[in-house]
From Swiss-Prot:
It comes from Lactiplantibacillus plantarum (strain ATCC BAA-793 / NCIMB 8826 / WCFS1). One of its GO terms (biological process) is ribosomal small subunit biogenesis. The lineage of its organism: Bacteria, Bacillati, Bacillota, Bacilli, Lactobacillales. GO terms for cellular component: cytoplasm; ribosome. An accessory protein needed during the final step in the assembly of 30S ribosomal subunit, possibly for assembly of the head region. Essential for efficient processing of 16S rRNA. May be needed both before and after RbfA during the maturation of 16S rRNA. It has affinity for free ribosomal 30S subunits but not for 70S ribosomes. GO terms for molecular function: ribosome binding. This is Ribosome maturation factor RimM. The gene is rimM. Residues 98-172 form the PRC barrel domain.
Amino acid sequence: MDYYRVGTLVNTHGIRGEVKVVVVTDFPEERFKVGQQLSLFKTPDETTGGITVKIAKAREQKGLYFLTFEGLDNINDVERYKGWTIKVPAEALHALPAGEYYYHQIVGLQVVTTADEPLGTIKEILSPGANDVWVVKRDHGQSDVLLPKIPQVIKDVDLDAGVVTVELMEGLID
């Protein structure tokens, strides 16, 4: 079964089993609602041997989520999971509108310019503010390129071919 990362359990909060979660999903209100089942994995790369938990309480504060899981009602029950990755099964993903993508669909794609010049590979996605930023790892030790996900820059995403076509704005490359 395939799992996809939606957060990281970064710390405990208080003594009643509440945990602090850094969110890496565009749908936190859906992923972290009461009754939702999640899987906890020791490392981000693990796909088997996860622990299934069910959310008993959830609240959002300053971009973080504070969760309590059913049956884990004190700090001793949850402390061992600090640093663990929170994932959902592939079946929990829903279809997105045209032009929208899950992170796992974008990371790893090759990037070429509109002049068909290879630029590199998307290695991660940042969400600093109004627009996501796609980080492109370049070949031969060149510095990474930060591409804002705006229509003026991202011209085409072809998931089948594994290629993103971009138009470089002045100043995007050193």
